[in-house]
Each structure stands twice: as structure tokens, then as C-alpha cells.
Amino acid sequence: MIQVYNRTTKSYEEELIAGKKYIEWTYESPVGKTITELIAKKKLFSKLYGKYCDTKLSKSKISPFVDSFNIDMAMSKKKINEFKSFNDFFTRELNFDARPINSDNNILISPGDGRITAYEDIDLDNIIQIKGLTYSLKELINDDNVASKYKNGICVVLRLCPTDYHRFHFIDSGIPYENHPIKGHYYSVNPIALKSVPKLFCENKREWSLFKSDNFKDVLHIEVGATCVGSIIQTYSPRVRVNKGDEKGYFKFGGSTTILFFEQGSIEIDADIIEQSKLGFECKVIFGENIGTKVL
């Protein structure tokens, strides 16, 4: 059972997991682990499933998915019968007023919907993946010069599960720079998998870019793919100014992760998120929600 912290009620909730039995089998049983290494983590598997999710045939999955996970379709721009495929539904846009954004330049917002953890004063060679497992930022982006900027900084991890809104956004106004894709595998990013696969984020397909933020110094954006995520789509234009809350991109079907690195002395993450992260719990957040403040 995966428990996440509800910041509003200040209580823990059990996460509803899409494909829970499959994930537990593939990452916790000997046979499942073998199948994962031979098939499930491969690009071909995710590519083929992604192709299916682009077909009209996949539309039949939408209504049962919405019902099973209580997805509020009133927030969607499209009605449920207007989607052309499951991926069309999965990458749905929300109504303009569905996610209010705090315009205060000193407020840091969540870049998307999901479950968030944050770590302060990070050791670049031992960043927490999950309790007991770490990874290196240099391995994650394959760029020592960029990685060194974030020594003793802050790492914010936003895990999106298949039931979430899957578009991610800029946390401030500023100028985004070129995207750097890195080839990799397609392991699940569910906590069950994170406990099983060392340096999972460094193993998976991922993309990174620098963002010259107006208020939070230089921010490192990283998007990590996962099982069945055939594509990470970047919708922004490099070196073109963006506003706070503008869309950066989206993930096609599957769970996925956005990771942000902040320079030392740039931000302060809300105390409840830091506390829960130390305890080993994620906090449930939505795009636009306040998660921290600028260091003045």
C-alpha cells in the first residue's frame, strides 16, 4: 500500500494505483523481474503500447478509467465523448480556471499535478531516490559543469501517476533553453519500482533543460519517462520568454516524473513538504499550488 500526505486535511491517504497487481508482480516477483528486464523496460514494448493508445480502438478504455479513478471531467476542455483516442484523453488540457496560479513573484508553484518530495542541501553524488537508494546528478544529466551549479541546492521531485493531469508547466517567468534528450529504459516510476531498481532515474529515458528564471535563479528541469510513456513532448520554444504557468510540455500514456533542481540560497520549500519527505512520504499537489517561497 502506498500512502501519500494530503496537505489540506493533514492526513494520509492510500493511493489508487493503475495496474497495481501488474506493477507488484513485475517488480517484486522473481519471474516478473525477469520479464521486466527482458521486455517491459525496452523501448519497443512502450512504443507498441503507445501506438495502441493513439488508435480509435483505445477509446473504449476512457470511460472505465475515469470511473475507476474518480477523475473530474468537469475540469477538462473536452467532453469525454470528444476524445479521439486514449492518449488524446490522457494528454487532455484543462479549463483555464481549473488550476489557479498565484501571481506573486515570491511564490514557487508546483509545475504539475502529482506527488511531491523535496530535499535540501543536496549532495550531488547521493541524491535520494527513495529511502535507502541514491543517484548522482552528474549521471542523471551527463553534464558535470551544469550539475556543479546545484551543489548544496534543493531537489524537488514530482511523480505523476497515470490518473493525473499529464501536462507540466513553468514555475516562473523567464527564458527556457534548449532541450537535451538522453536515451534510456522505460522502468515504472511507481514507488514499488523505485525500491527495486537502483538509480532508476539515471536508467530511464529522460530530457533536461535550463531555465533562466526571473525570480528563482537558474532552474534545472528534468523530465523522466516511464513504462508505456512512448513520448515526452516539449511544447515550448527555446530562448523565447515565457510567463509563470505557461505550458512546457506533456507526457503521453504512463506514469512519469518531473525533477527540478534549484541553486543554493534561491528558494525555501514549504515546511510540511520537507517534513513529509524526511519521513518518507510524498505530498499530493496540483499544478499551481504553492510549494515554496523565494529567499529574499
Curated annotation (Swiss-Prot):
Heterodimer of a large membrane-associated beta subunit and a small pyruvoyl-containing alpha subunit. This is Phosphatidylserine decarboxylase proenzyme. The active site is at 113 (charge relay system), 169 (charge relay system), 256 (charge relay system), 256 (schiff-base intermediate with substrate). The keyword Lyase applies. The keyword Glycoprotein does not apply. It catalyses: a 1,2-diacyl-sn-glycero-3-phospho-L-serine + H(+) = a 1,2-diacyl-sn-glycero-3-phosphoethanolamine + CO2. Is synthesized initially as an inactive proenzyme. Formation of the active enzyme involves a self-maturation process in which the active site pyruvoyl group is generated from an internal serine residue via an autocatalytic post-translational modification. Two non-identical subunits are generated from the proenzyme in this reaction, and the pyruvate is formed at the N-terminus of the alpha chain, which is derived from the carboxyl end of the proenzyme. Its cofactor is pyruvate. GO terms for cellular component: plasma membrane. The modification Pyruvic acid (Ser) is found at residue 256. The record marks 255-256 as: Cleavage (non-hydrolytic). It comes from Clostridium beijerinckii (strain ATCC 51743 / NCIMB 8052) (Clostridium acetobutylicum). Binds 1 pyruvoyl group covalently per subunit. It is a peripheral membrane protein. Pfam families: PS_Dcarbxylase (PF02666). One of its GO terms (molecular function) is phosphatidylserine decarboxylase activity.
